Amino acid sequence: MQQYSILVLHGPNLNLLGKREPNIYGSVTLDEINLLLSEEAKNLDVTVTCVQSNHEGILIDTIHQAWGLHQGIIINAGAYTHTSVAIRDALSAVKIPTVEVHLSNIYQRETFRHHSYIAPVAIGQISGFGVGSYRLGLLAIVEYLRKLENNH
């Protein structure tokens, strides 16, 4: 069985987790999320590389660089979820299976958050489970990749 490498992308303002609107996003920091993902990755015998940026171009460049390096992507694009055709196009271009995750349930929030440019190019979307959304996203992408491998 192949050992997969998963890129985890955190978008704008996620560096403020634990401080920013804890009533919506919880009190867990981004470093704690990354640690949780690293521990879960070990249990699944995969590796994760976590990148956070507040800049759309850096996120796009990181997606481009993932081509041939990572077999899966987990992305929480933050507010770019609802605005960035460029991130959507980058994900579509590299054709790496992607799971979109959100800490909060974006469909229970403001109407402008109900639309995702990423969802149509992702294999799935997980939202509303707090930190668990990331863990579920990792489990989902690994299961997807293993099924894909077994079918070939």
Swiss-Prot record:
EC number: 4.2.1.10
Active site: Y25 (proton acceptor), H102 (proton donor)
Record keywords, A-Z: Amino-acid biosynthesis, Aromatic amino acid biosynthesis, Lyase
CDD domains found in the cross-reference section: DHQase_II
GO biological process, one term: aromatic amino acid family biosynthetic process
SUPFAM superfamilies on file: Type II 3-dehydroquinate dehydratase
Record-annotated site: Transition state stabilizer: R20
GO function terms (MF aspect): 3-dehydroquinate dehydratase activity
PANTHER family per UniProt: CATABOLIC 3-DEHYDROQUINASE
Family: Belongs to the type-II 3-dehydroquinase family.
Purpose of the protein: Catalyzes a trans-dehydration via an enolate intermediate.
Protein name stated in the entry: 3-dehydroquinate dehydratase
Native species: Gloeothece citriformis (strain PCC 7424)
